[in-house]
Design a protein with these regions (language model features):
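Beta-strand/loop-rich accessory regions of lumenal/periplasmic or secreted enzymes
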Residues: 1-180
C-alpha cells in the first residue's frame, strides 16, 4: 500500500484498488484483470431520484436544497493498517450542491426542468450532509463500506439516500445483499 499524491493505492493477489483522498471513495477497482470501477463511476452518496406526481408536495424542496447536484469534499481522513493485512480508510466527507436551483414543469411536455442559480452559491447554512465513512480493504481484496450520514436539516424529507456507482455493462446480472 502507498499514497501517491491524492490517491491511496493497494495491490494484492488478483486485485488493485485506488482511493481518491479528496472525495473519500474508490476511484479504481480491478479484480483479476477486470476493471469494475473506473474514475468517473466511483461510489458516491446520492439523495435524489426523478420526481413523480405523488411528490408534488416536496419535489421543489429537493431541488432547492441541491439534492440533485451533490459535490463531495473530504474534510479529514486517516489511514490505519490493522492486523491480518487489513487497512481502514476513515473519511469525514461534506456533500453539498455548489449553488441554489429551482424546479419547473413544462406543461406541454410534462417534463421537469432544473435551473441552476450560479449567482447564489451555497454556504455553511445551506443544506449539506456530513458522512463519517470507513472503507476496509482486506488482504484478499474484499472491501466493505460503513457510513454514518447526517445533515444540518434533519427534518427535510429525502427521496432516497444511498451510494450509487456504475458497473461495466458485462456485469448487468448481479445479486444485491444489502438493505433497501
Amino acid at each position: 500500500t502507498k499514497t501517491i499524491g491524492d490517491r491511496w493505492v493497494a495491490t494484492g493477489k488478483d486485485f488493485d484498488v485506488a482511493f481518491d483522498l479528496k472525495q473519500g471513495t474508490i476511484s479504481r477497482l480491478v479484480y483479476s484483470g477486470d476493471t469494475l470501477i473506473r474514475e468517473g463511476n466511483e461510489p458516491r452518496l446520492t439523495a435524489f431520484r426523478a420526481p413523480c406526481d405523488n411528490d408534488v408536495w416536496i419535489r421543489s424542496q429537493w431541488v432547492a436544497n441541491g439534492l440533485h447536484n451533490l459535490h463531495h469534499k473530504v474534510l479529514s481522513h486517516k489511514i490505519t493498517e490493522l492486523p491480518g493485512g487489513r487497512v481502514e480508510l476513515y473519511f469525514t466527507v461534506r456533500s453539498q450542491a455548489p449553488n441554489a436551483a429551482s424546479l419547473s414543469m413544462k406543461k406541454a411536455s410534462g417534463r421537469y426542468q432544473i435551473t441552476e442559480d450560479t449567482s447564489r452559491p451555497f454556504g455553511d447554512e445551506d443544506f449539506h450532509f456530513i458522512s463519517e465513512v470507513v472503507w476496509t480493504v482486506y488482504s484478499d481484496g474484499k472491501i466493505t463500506l460503513r457510513s454514518n450520514i447526517s445533515s444540518n436539516k434533519p427534518h427535510l424529507t429525502l427521496a432516497r439516500l444511498g451510494y450509487e456507482f456504475v458497473l461495466p455493462q458485462q456485469y448487468e446480472d448481479y445479486t444485491y445483499y444489502g438493505r433497501g
